[in-house]
């Protein structure tokens, strides 16, 4: 038997649903009065900058931070050699698609353009930016993967070859597979057999964020 759809009658006691809500901070926002995280300036505060990789896939053969450390106003310069090597997941979701442990704060290998290479903390954003330009990095350029079909090819290079990698669910580093999920609704074979027309196509979707709630600034 097919499930019965029950429609809940509209409740007259609702105070918010279906009614306009006043934006209590609208006036202050248009006047520029509220202080956001990036507006805070504590006494003696340092400013951090990140050196990003220009390469999609490479190993760091050598990294020289001596000139950056000598720059006046620089408090610290960190590379993968200076911090604990702790693997973690950047995925915020859990089952049915848990993320594998495949990320390090800093690593001797970069896996995408923009990957983190070094951190700098300085007395001003300008000094920190200057320090980044003084860091000398020698890369061993590796073959890169720019297409998802290429990534899952049997002969594709392995992006995550680190021994610390931890699989979750159907993820598989050997196949460059971060996650896999299949959802079937109804009798698929019967549906195809009874269909008057069958349309086949491939669809590619960009990376999306449904709710922008994660912080992008911290003090």
Which residue ranges define each predicted feature?
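Histidine-centered active-site/metal-ligand motif
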Residues: 57, 176, 180, 216
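Non-catalytic, substrate/partner-engaging modules appended to enzymatic cores
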Residues: 4, 173, 177-183, 204, ...
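Flexible, low-hydrophobicity surface segments
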Residues: 1-171, 198-201
């Amino acid at each position: 038997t097919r499930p019965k759809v029950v429609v809940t009658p509209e409740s007259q006691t609702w105070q918010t649903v279906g009614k306009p809500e006043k934006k209590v901070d609208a006036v202050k926002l248009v006047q520029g009065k509220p202080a956001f995280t990036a507006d805070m300036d504590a006494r003696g505060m340092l400013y951090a900058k990140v050196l990003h990789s220009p390469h999609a896939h490479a190993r760091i053969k050598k990294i020289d931070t001596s000139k950056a450390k000598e720059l006046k106003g620089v408090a610290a310069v960190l590379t993968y050699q200076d911090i604990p090597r702790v693997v973690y997941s950047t995925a915020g979701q859990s089952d049915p698609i848990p993320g594998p442990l495949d990320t390090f704060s800093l690593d001797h290998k970069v896996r995408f353009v923009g990957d983190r290479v070094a951190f700098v903390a300085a007395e001003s954003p300008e000094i920190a930016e200057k320090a980044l330009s003084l860091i000398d990095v020698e890369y061993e350029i590796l073959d890169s993967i720019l297409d998802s079909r290429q990534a899952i090819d049997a002969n594709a290079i392995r992006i995550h070859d680190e021994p610390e990698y931890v699989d979750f669910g159907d993820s598989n580093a050997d196949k460059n597979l971060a996650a896999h999920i299949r959802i079937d609704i109804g009798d698929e074979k019967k549906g195809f057999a009874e269909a008057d027309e069958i349309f086949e196509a491939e669809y590619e979707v960009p990376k999306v964020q449904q709710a922008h709630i994660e912080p992008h600034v911290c003090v």
